Amino acid sequence: MADQLTEEQIAEFKEAFSLFDKDGDGTITTKELGTVMRSLGQNPTEAELQDMINEVDADGNGTIDFPEFLSLMARKMKDTDTEEELIEAFKVFDRDGNGLISAAELRHVMTNLGEKLTDEEVDEMIREADIDGDGHINYEEFVRMMMAK
């Protein structure tokens, strides 16, 4: 999987890896993994980090070497918001299936997620994502918003 990375990506990952390999022994500790990945623009949850560490740290010694790290990053990058996932997420918000997310639809989904938002907050979210200014979020605007996170 790491063979799908460009030389530039590998060099970038090596540089980040080296920053956290304090003693230069070619390994980083598992608790440093989250810091390394965040420095590369990934945003794993604690649960995801634990899963990744469990997958990579086969001997359970608490350290990860560079080849393991490369494999991990390649896998993580491949998993980053595929088009199918974005389409599915858009459909969750676009409750009436008209290809647009309205303020009411956004409020409904956010409320179901436990986010109690004021009308002003919902309107602000729409405004931030609404590139063409029609008061709704279309699929293209949704993708841009999701990729900007």
Curated annotation (Swiss-Prot):
Location of N-acetylalanine modifications: 2
The protein's name: Calmodulin
UniProt xrefs under SMART domains: EFh (SM00054)
Binding sites annotated in the UniProt record for Ca(2+) 2: 57, 59, 61, 63, 68
UniProt keyword annotation of Repeat present: yes
CC per GO annotation: myosin II complex
Pfam families found in the cross-reference section: EF-hand_7 (PF13499)
Membership in a protein family: Belongs to the calmodulin family.
UniProt binding sites for Ca(2+) 1: 21, 23, 25, 27, 32
Reported function: Calmodulin mediates the control of a large number of enzymes, ion channels and other proteins by Ca(2+). Among the enzymes to be stimulated by the calmodulin-Ca(2+) complex are a number of protein kinases and phosphatases.
CDD domains: EFh
